[in-house]
From Swiss-Prot:
Sample GO molecular function, one term: argininosuccinate lyase activity
Source organism: Anaeromyxobacter sp. (strain K)
Keyword flag Magnesium: no
Protein name: Argininosuccinate lyase
Catalytic activities: 2-(N(omega)-L-arginino)succinate = fumarate + L-arginine
Localization per Swiss-Prot or TrEMBL: Cytoplasm
């Protein structure tokens, strides 16, 4: 596109002279909203096609505009559009290049439309696409976890609370917890998409237009479910943007949790997992290092996602109806947040699906028996002892075990009987971790049958998603 810095912006038609360069510098948004060129052009093509159908613009002119906008889109995609700060934003860049291609016919395009409803539409179209991209990335992530879970149905390890060994679980059950988390994230993106997929075009600057637009036809052309119902709200509503960034932030927090576990589990101290070399880095100084940067970056990206959400909410806070220029500042967090999530999710998926999990080391971590103390308490409950009484008895046994320097699993039946009269010889069976899991078959529990049922449920769900 030819530079034309002396061109007067369309928004200054009633103003004398040129804008102060300092205001121009403050106002420029093309470096951010330039990423919306495809959505902007798509909305313009639907709008001008409707104008022609309504007899507001000549059909031949509309056809030339639609064809020229295809060319403008291709030029943007090829990097041939040189951004001119004097044109401020993506809308003006598109309109100016269109004018160079079709001449005065370009002037038809903006009939019945304001920048306010135009940018609101662009953002909604972006949000719909972003939700689809995030959903696809999270599905890939779920598949990575599901594949490892299927391979490790029989691998057992300590489950943790407060990062202390708590009770035994299977590795499959542990990994399926992340499949659940990312499933909820996908539901949130679907909800955001549903609310975003309506058209604000026809709302004008704030009060619609006197032209006989067909708003529903535009929405249908764009694949949207309907139209907004209040023009004041439509041009100033950024709820879907905030909801999208919340969904991104929560998914990023979930990614930070597996990121932390990848960091911990790959330490020599834990030794539960080894990352593929393809998903690890070295050190510029220490030649022996193999660093879990993928997990650390996943943790760090959560901070950025939270910051994007808070930044947008702060921009929206206290804005009177309807449109205010503050809303220009929503582009940077909105446009960057979903793409950062997709990048992080794909990297974590690759790390998980190529990781090696060390079953022997995980089972070794259960060896001292304290992770099965709850089973000993429930042994008494099965024999009619109130739980609090049983809890106290096993607590005394745990304290004795610590003083004696012997694992609870190595205490004798006679010693157990000193802590409660209802302990008998078979109490020692409580310290068989695999037996413990077999006794935990409630829906959602880590028992083998319960876990297999969840594996089948998720395989069916993700199979349908792929189909």
């Amino acid at each position: 596109m030819r530079a034309n810095s002396k061109a007067k912006p369309v928004s200054r038609a009633a103003l004398a002279g040129e804008a102060d360069p300092r205001l121009v510098a403050l106002s420029v948004s093309i470096q951010d909203d330039g990423a919306l060129y495809a959505e902007d052009i798509r909305g313009s093509q639907a709008h001008v096609s409707m104008l022609a159908a309504q007899g507001i613009v000549p059909k031949a002119a509309a056809r030339r505009i639609v064809a020229a906008l295809d060319q403008v889109r291709a030029e943007f995609a090829a990097g041939k559009i040189r951004f001119d700060p004097a044109l401020e934003d993506v809308h003006t860049h598109v309109e100016r290049r269109l004018g160079e291609l079709v001449g005065k016919d370009a002037g038809y395009l903006h009939a019945g439309r304001s920048r306010n409803d135009q940018v609101a539409l662009d953002e909604r179209l972006f949000i719909v696409g972003a939700c689809d991209r995030c959903d696809a990335a999270l599905e890939r992530l779920q598949r990575a976890f599901l594949g490892q879970a299927r391979a490790h149905e029989r691998t057992i390890l300590p489950g943790y609370t407060h990062l202390q060994r708590a009770q035994p679980v299977s590795l499959a059950h542990h990994l399926l917890a992340y499949v659940e988390m990312f499933g909820r994230d996908r539901e949130r993106f679907a909800e955001v998409r549903r609310r975003a997929a309506i058209s604000p075009l026809g709302s004008g600057a704030l009060a619609g237009t006197t032209l006989p637009l067909d708003r529903e036809a535009v929405a249908a052309r764009l694949g949207l479910a309907g139209v907004t119902h209040n023009s004041l709200d439509a041009v100033s509503d950024r709820d879907s943007a905030a909801e999208l960034l919340f969904a991104c932030a929560l998914a990023a927090v979930h990614l930070s949790r597996i990121g932390e576990e990848l960091v911990l589990w790959t330490t020599k101290e834990f030794g539960f997992a080894t990352l593929s070399d393809a998903f690890a880095t070295g050190s510029s100084l220490m030649p022996q290092k193999k660093n879990p940067d993928v997990g650390e970056l996943a943790r760090g990206r959560a901070g950025r996602a939270l910051g994007d959400l808070v930044a947008l909410l702060a921009i929206l806070k206290g804005l009177p109806l309807s449109y205010n220029r503050d809303l220009q500042e929503d582009k940077r967090p909105l446009l960057g947040g979903p793409e950062a999530l997709v990048l992080t999710a794909d990297a974590v998926a690759g790390a998980v699906e190529t990781a090696t999990f060390h079953a022997a080391r995980m089972e070794e971590a259960l060896g001292s028996g304290e992770a099965l103390a709850t089973d000993a308490a429930e042994y008494l409950v099965d024999r009619g002892v109130p739980f609090r009484e049983a809890h106290e008895a096993v607590g005394k046994a745990a304290a004795f075990s610590a003083r004696e320097g012997r694992p609870m699993a190595r205490l004798t039946a006679a010693e157990w009987a000193t802590f409660h009269r209802r302990f008998e010889k078979d109490v020692l069976r409580c310290f068989d971790a695999r037996r413990s899991l077999r006794r935990r078959e409630l829906p959602g529990a880590p028992g083998p049958r319960a876990v297999r049922a969840e594996l089948r449920r998720w395989e069916k769900a993700l199979g349908k998603a792929r189909g």
